[in-house]
């Protein structure tokens, strides 16, 4: 009897040890392995402006109480060779938070605000050339005692993309913040109504039409969805094989080398102006952002082509039939998950973490329009057509299939070729609607972006309170004047707003 009990206890102990080992070691997901391939060694970087002076001890203690509870932030990357096959795992380790918090010594007494902005841009750009140390978890926080034109001090968060996508990271960072009006409350995001093509439209149709016509409409909608998805799939395949964008002044010839220096700048505009246009044109914020971006890119290219052909300065300068497409990132999660991530760090609960993003190949219509509202209408028409497709889901699924069948290196080559044949990346994230604090430090703006992928231009938009921050990550050898692109974006927004106000007042 004793022998049986001992054996059973031994089995229980062995099972417990196995379970602990499994919890201590986690294999990298296929997407995480992809982000460690040389062609896709991507990093997420976020510049956070703070309203008050940084107190490093408060931030370090806050990180210990929050981020350290998340397994990805307390695990390091380990490469093992098993039967001549390389295996990558996340292995839990003891983290010394102070080693991840970097406080550079800056001689600020002779730096004015304008020069401080240049210093910050140079500092962040230099970070893009320095890889993270793989002997410890792949994240770091830089605390800069630097007063800029729009912040008292600045924090810079740098995280390897294999830890999760932009939505994961943004939600996680927001889960570490609190409302300034109520320090015990998590920030809230604006409600996003995502009506499915099913429920509400089907109910309305069933009231208005007979069942026969209702069935015809359902079949027609399904047929359009399938047709659009097939067309988008064929375009993606063609792009991966041979279909290239026009060689414009903003398209890099990207054989992205390791440690390539990227330049990062940002500009903040009023979100109220975006909403004014949105309400007048009966669009979404994303529609307006896409339309203004299309107008801004057209203005910027007009100048660049004019510089190349000074003799034609009085003409439109822009060649006809430009193919300029963006890889538009789409979050595939049903919810943003701030509460789930906060629970994860306090209770150990699980939520959908990792890289859950798909791509849409979005064609910008580059042209000069007498009526700036044409850019809005064209952008809305294009994105509405893309919404009636499963392209984002398809690219996510195909990416996983390629990784599982071809392996990381070959899949990286295919995806790298597809992205290299487009011109730029584009993403838009929704932020908190009220003022928040980051470990006791009031936040003035959030400017996230990503680098390491084969694009000379990445445009990222982040809303916060009543502001919208535009972050540009550019290859300075291709786009040497990113601030002028920001100027063109801002001027396009202003001109569209003026036209909208004039037409609204005359109605």
Swiss-Prot record:
Mostly expressed in flowers and siliques. GO terms for molecular function: diacylglycerol O-acyltransferase activity; long-chain-alcohol O-fatty-acyltransferase activity. It comes from the Eukaryota. The keyword Aminoacyl-tRNA synthetase does not apply. The active site is at 161 (proton acceptor). Its EC number is 2.3.1.20, 2.3.1.75. Signal peptide: none annotated. Disulfide bonds: none annotated. Glycans are attached at residues 314, 421. One of its GO terms (cellular component) is endoplasmic reticulum membrane. Pathway: Glycerolipid metabolism; triacylglycerol biosynthesis; Lipid metabolism. The keyword Thylakoid does not apply. Keywords: Acyltransferase, Cell membrane, Endoplasmic reticulum, Glycoprotein, Membrane, Transferase, Transmembrane, Transmembrane helix. It is a single-pass membrane protein. It catalyses: a long chain fatty alcohol + a fatty acyl-CoA = a wax ester + CoA; an acyl-CoA + a 1,2-diacyl-sn-glycerol = a triacyl-sn-glycerol + CoA. The chain crosses the membrane at residues 212-232. Residues 233-507 are lumenal. PANTHER family: O-ACYLTRANSFERASE (WSD1-LIKE) FAMILY PROTEIN, WAX ESTER SYNTHASE_DIACYLGLYCEROL ACYLTRANSFERASE 4-RELATED. Bifunctional wax ester synthase/diacylglycerol acyltransferase. Involved in cuticular wax biosynthesis. This is Wax ester synthase/diacylglycerol acyltransferase 5. It comes from Arabidopsis thaliana.
